[in-house]
């Protein structure tokens, strides 16, 4: 499919800055694909320009505090009630939602090889493989982690997720996310977040694609507090990009899929739902380049907690306890003196799902490869393998720059339950726990 031939009409921001995208996190944006499509000084005029319909999309209750209130006004060719015919329940494939109890694996530290790219034709919806679920989709708490394998673009198919917002983390191949708010293109080392309720389709850009997907049932991702770090570093607001308006006036049959309550439903439409000509508000999809993250670390001694690398957080009702933290381990300098520099041995109240986009992870130089994954559930010990321990314990402590690496972690307060696919797909490494077998007793009471 030639994606460049699709009949989208691109818009612009009112400031005409950064063609294709508007800069900022959580801003109140405004953008129009036709001049004058946005009403001035009001949200729902008696008659909208160009014969459009005004529609509000709310991502929070009306009475949420102003700082947490999320909504956008859309000016579209048809209202969304015309996008919802008679829905029929349809097969979910390998997509699962919490709570999900499918296997009888004993508790353990787990690690998976990357899945091979399939030969059959798989769209995004067909290519989702759920690895873990946590919490409960019906109480809007918790998350699910998925892999995606895509070998063909969605054509005359669209989707929205009522259960949660979705974070795409490409590992191989680029994606073009055609949303009703505009068009987002992402490549490995970039992420995109599509809030719940926003319609989109997934297209391939440069061949088959593989990556990770976090489905957030809880509070929307937001930037973490910096505390004494101050006003700069970590993920800076200006580096987040939201698309300008783009629309299709396309009267061809299409299917609309909706994930709702852990099930998948489908309806048929006689037209494309990507028909928003203009919009304004702060509830919108966005992208972020992980390579713009400015890491902060120890410049004297000791290894800081991994929370120092948080990009985005989904807060829970308990202050300081995340529904999800999205954490990365990017290129950085290691300079701490008289210090064991890799991540230390650890038991944690949080449950950690890790993936590797490219390069080598410093605590696991073997076995944890790009496209693979690991799971260290709550209160299960983990840490460097024998090779990493020996190297870090005996190596010269000169400044070292970790280059060509990008690992990440989805960390949640809830136990992550492994799906049947994750347990029996053949990707699970049976010998993962053996990586610690070489750690010998080193204690000698006669040698301090």
Curated annotation (Swiss-Prot):
SUPFAM superfamilies: RmlC-like cupins
Pathway(s) where this gene product acts: Amino-acid degradation; L-phenylalanine degradation; acetoacetate and fumarate from L-phenylalanine: step 4/6
GO biological process, one term: tyrosine catabolic process
KW Iron (keyword) present: yes
Gene Ontology CC: cytoplasm
Active-site residues from the entry: 303 (proton acceptor)
InterPro entries assigned: HgmA_C (IPR046451), HgmA_N (IPR046452), Homogentis_dOase (IPR005708), Homogentis_dOase_bac (IPR022950), RmlC-like_jellyroll (IPR014710), RmlC_Cupin_sf (IPR011051)
Name of the featured protein: Homogentisate 1,2-dioxygenase
Gene: hmgA
């Amino acid at each position: 499919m030639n994606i460049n031939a699709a009949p989208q009409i691109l818009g612009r921001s009112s400031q005409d800055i950064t063609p294709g995208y508007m800069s900022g996190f959580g801003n109140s944006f405004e953008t129009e694909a036709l001049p004058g499509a946005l009403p001035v000084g009001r949200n729902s005029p008696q008659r909208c320009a160009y014969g459009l319909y005004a529609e509000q999309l709310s991502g929070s209750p009306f009475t949420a505090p102003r700082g947490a209130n999320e909504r956008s006004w859309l000016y579209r060719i048809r209202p969304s009630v015309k996008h919802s015919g008679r829905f029929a329940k349809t097969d979910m494939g390998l997509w699962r939602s919490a709570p999900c109890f499918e296997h009888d694996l004993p508790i353990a530290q787990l690690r998976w090889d990357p899945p091979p790219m399939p030969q059959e034709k798989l769209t995004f919806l067909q290519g989702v493989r759920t690895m873990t679920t946590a919490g409960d989709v019906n109480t809007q708490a918790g998350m699910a982690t998925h892999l995606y394998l895509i070998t063909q673009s969605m054509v005359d198919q669209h989707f929205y997720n009522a259960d949660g917002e979705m974070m795409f983390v490409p590992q191989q191949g680029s994606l073009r996310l055609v949303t009703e708010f505009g068009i987002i293109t992402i490549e490995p080392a970039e992420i995109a977040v599509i809030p719940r309720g926003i319609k989109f389709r997934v297209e391939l850009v440069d061949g088959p694609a593989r990556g990770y997907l976090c489905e957030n049932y809880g509070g929307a991702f937001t930037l973490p507090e910096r505390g004494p770090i101050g006003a700069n570093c970590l993920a800076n607001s200006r580096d987040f990009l939201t698309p300008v308006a783009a629309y299709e006036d396309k009267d061809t049959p299409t299917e609309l899929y909706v994930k709702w309550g852990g099930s998948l439903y489908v309806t048929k439409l006689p037209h494309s739902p990507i028909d928003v000509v203009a919009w304004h508000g702060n509830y919108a999809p966005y992208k972020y380049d992980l390579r713009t993250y400015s890491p902060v670390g120890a410049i004297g001694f000791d290894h800081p907690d991994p929370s120092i690398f948080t990009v985005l957080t989904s807060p829970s009702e308990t202050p300081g306890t995340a529904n999800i933290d999205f954490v990365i381990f990017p290129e950085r300098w290691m300079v701490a003196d008289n210090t064991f520099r890799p991540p230390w041995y650890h038991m944690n109240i949080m449950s950690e799902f890790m993936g590797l986009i490219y390069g080598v992870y410093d605590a696991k130089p073997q076995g944890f490869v790009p496209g693979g994954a690991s799971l260290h559930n709550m209160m299960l010990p983990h840490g460097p393998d024998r090779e990493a321990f020996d190297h870090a314990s005996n190596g010269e402590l000169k400044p070292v720059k970790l280059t060509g690496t990008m690992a990440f972690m989805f960390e949640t307060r809830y136990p992550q339950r492994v799906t049947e696919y994750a347990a029996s797909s053949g990707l699970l490494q049976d010998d993962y726990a053996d990586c610690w077998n070489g750690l010998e007793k080193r204690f000698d009471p006669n040698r301090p």
